[in-house]
Swiss-Prot record:
ATPase required for the post-translational delivery of tail-anchored (TA) proteins to the endoplasmic reticulum. Recognizes and selectively binds the transmembrane domain of TA proteins in the cytosol. This complex then targets to the endoplasmic reticulum by membrane-bound receptors GET1 and GET2, where the tail-anchored protein is released for insertion. This process is regulated by ATP binding and hydrolysis. ATP binding drives the homodimer towards the closed dimer state, facilitating recognition of newly synthesized TA membrane proteins. ATP hydrolysis is required for insertion. The active site is at D57. Homodimer. Component of the Golgi to ER traffic (GET) complex, which is composed of GET1, GET2 and GET3. Within the complex, GET1 and GET2 form a heterotetramer which is stabilized by phosphatidylinositol binding and which binds to the GET3 homodimer. Interacts with the chloride channel protein GEF1. CDD domains: ArsA. NCBIfam families: GET3_arsA_TRC40. Zn(2+) binds at C281, C284. ATP binds at K26, G27, G28, V29, G30, K31, T32, T33, E242, N269. InterPro entries: Anion-transp_ATPase-like_dom, ATPase_ArsA/GET3, ATPase_ArsA/GET3_euk, P-loop_NTPase. It comes from Lodderomyces elongisporus (strain ATCC 11503 / CBS 2605 / JCM 1781 / NBRC 1676 / NRRL YB-4239). This is ATPase GET3. Keywords: ATP-binding, Cytoplasm, Endoplasmic reticulum, Golgi apparatus, Hydrolase, Metal-binding, Nucleotide-binding, Transport, Zinc. Transmembrane segments: none annotated. Pfam families: ArsA_ATPase. PANTHER family: ARSENICAL PUMP-DRIVING ATPASE ARSENITE-TRANSLOCATING ATPASE, ATPASE GET3.
Length: 349
């Protein structure tokens, strides 16, 4: 039975229960533009609620997309009072973790400290794990009024602008990575604890550190439960209409399904819609022919997905006003004949 799903993200934008939205795909397909557009539409459609857009990609682009500098602290978007952005720095998170370890044990000769440093640098996915720990820390500590520790912002939905596919999939494997890390630490604590004490290691400091790791694991396990609940979490795939991008999208969807994560929306960017051009160039016609071929394949392969088709514009999509104009096609399908003027009316930033 063929499903006739709406080719927009309107159901996602209007869903009341979503707490987490991940946006990911191959590098260079427009993930940041898409995640920014989703965040803008959420803020516009629900002005009474607060939203947070987080970049976990080391090559941050949110500042460029909004023409506004963001950092590791959540900052309000100028022109949208209920949307905040932040850019997570894994290197800074690693440095913070090492500093915290030194606070628990300031003995430079403690062998456990050296072992821990080697382990945290060698376990696959540790960068992504640290990024997520940083996310949890900032969400927990974010306040409406910095002078009132009890008055915290309650974000209706948090949107993740993720790194290219491989990093994103490791990011979503975070709970197992942390469990592996914590298990090794606990094993070392049990086997080497007495020896560390004999060598001068601070048993009390080590115990405090392991208790903190247990707390982190508990918090992450709770978030992981939410990640596998389709009422709370969904993943939006972003691609372009080319073979390699389609192949990568299918691979990513299969992996996401293995994590039991909900994914039912695909945004296809940079479409030319050359059939409706009054004076199309030969190169545009040729590329549009190729794009249509892969669009047809996607329509057949993902008939039970919301397949959103977004146009290639004549300029970069930067700034809140341009994002507002572009993002409306997440809610209402782009019409090449009626909406053609949008391609040239965007203001360069």
């Amino acid at each position: 039975m063929e499903l006739d799903l709406e080719p927009t993200l309107k159901p996602l934008i209007e869903q009341d229960t979503l707490k987490w939205i991940f946006v990911g795909g191959k590098g260079g397909v427009g993930k940041t533009t898409t995640s920014s557009s989703i965040a803008v539409q959420l803020a516009l459609q629900h002005p009474e609620s607060e939203f947070l857009l987080i970049s976990t990609d080391p090559a941050h682009n949110l500042s460029d997309a909004f023409c506004q500098k963001f950092g590791k602290e959540a900052r309000k978007v100028e022109g949208l009072s209920n949307l905040s952005c932040m850019e997570i720095d894994p290197e800074a998170a690693m440095s913070d973790l090492q500093q915290q370890a030194q606070q628990y044990n300031n003995d430079p000769n403690d062998p456990l400290k050296s072992i821990m440093s080697d382990m945290t640098g060698s376990i696959p996915g540790i960068d992504e794990a640290l990024s997520f720990m940083e996310v949890l820390k900032h969400i927990k500590n974010q306040k409406v009024n910095e002078n009132d520790s009890k008055d915290k912002i309650s974000y209706r939905t948090i949107i993740f602008d993720t790194a290219p596919t491989g990093h994103t999939l490791r990011f979503l494997q975070l709970p197992s990575t942390l469990q592996k890390l914590l298990g090794k630490f606990q094993q070392l604590s049990g086997k080497l604890g007495p020896m560390m004490s004999m060598l001068g290691g601070g048993a009390g400091g080590q115990q405090d550190m392991f208790e903190k790791l247990n707390e982190v694991q508990k918090n992450v396990a709770e978030v992981n439960e939410q990640f596998t609940d389709p009422e709370l979490t969904t993943f939006v795939c972003v691609c372009i209409s080319e073979f390699l991008s389609l192949y990568e999208t299918e691979r990513m969807i299969q992996e996401l399904m293995s994590y039991k994560m909900d994914v039912n929306s695909i945004v296809v960017n940079q479409l030319l819609f050359a059939d409706d051009d009054e004076n199309p160039c030969l190169r545009c016609v040729s590329r549009w022919k190729m794009q249509k071929k892969y669009l047809d394949q996607m329509a057949e392969l993902y008939e039970d997905y919301h397949l959103v088709k977004m146009p290639l514009l004549g300029t970069e999509i930067r700034g809140v006003e341009n994002l507002k104009k572009f993002s409306k096609f997440l809610m209402v399908p782009y019409d090449p004949k009626k909406d053609r003027g949008l391609i040239t009316e965007m203001k360069e930033q």
